[in-house]
Amino acid sequence: MEPVSNATVYIVDDDAGVREALAWLLRSRRLPSESFDSAEAFEAMLQTRPPQRQPCCLLLDVRMPGMSGLALFDLLVARGSLHTMPVIFLTGHADVPTAVDAVKRGAFDFCEKPFSDNALVDRIEQALAQSGERLAELRERS
C-alpha cells in the first residue's frame, strides 16, 4: 500500500519506551508522527490546532494515569472526530475485551501488545487511507 501523503500518526501512550519505539517504527516507514505522554496532552493539542485538513490516525493506549484512553475515545466519539481520525487502540492482553467493545463503538481496530510491526503498519496505512477518503468526501460536499 502506498503511504498517504501529508498524513500524521498521533501516538498517545504514557510509556516513553512505547512512544519512542512506535515513532522509530513509523519513521522507518516514512510515516510522520507526533507523540503525547497523556490523553490530556493530546486533548490540549486538539483544542489549539486548526480544524483537521490532512489524513491522520490515532494510536491510543487503553490504560493510562489520569484520563484513560477509553475516556479520550469517548470524548472523540461525542465530538464526531472518529469520522476523519480513525483510532487504533494499543492494549495488553487483559484489555482485549475492552478494546473489542471500543471497536464495536467506532474504533478502527486494536493491536495487542506486543504487536507485529508489519501488521500494525498495515493497519495504520489502512486507517490513514480511510481518513484521506473521508476528508476528500467532506471537501467535495463543501
Model regions: which residues?
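Two-component/phosphorelay signaling modules centered on CheY-like receiver
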Residues: 2, 16-34
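Receiver (REC) domain active-site loop signature in two-component systems and cognate sites
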Residues: 64
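Active-site residues of response regulator receiver
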Residues: 60-61, 91
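Acidic catalytic/metal-coordinating carboxylates
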Residues: 37-38, 68-74
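C-terminal output helix
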Residues: 95-97, 111-125
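Active-site beta3 strand of CheY-like receiver
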Residues: 50-60
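The C-terminal output helix
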Residues: 125-139
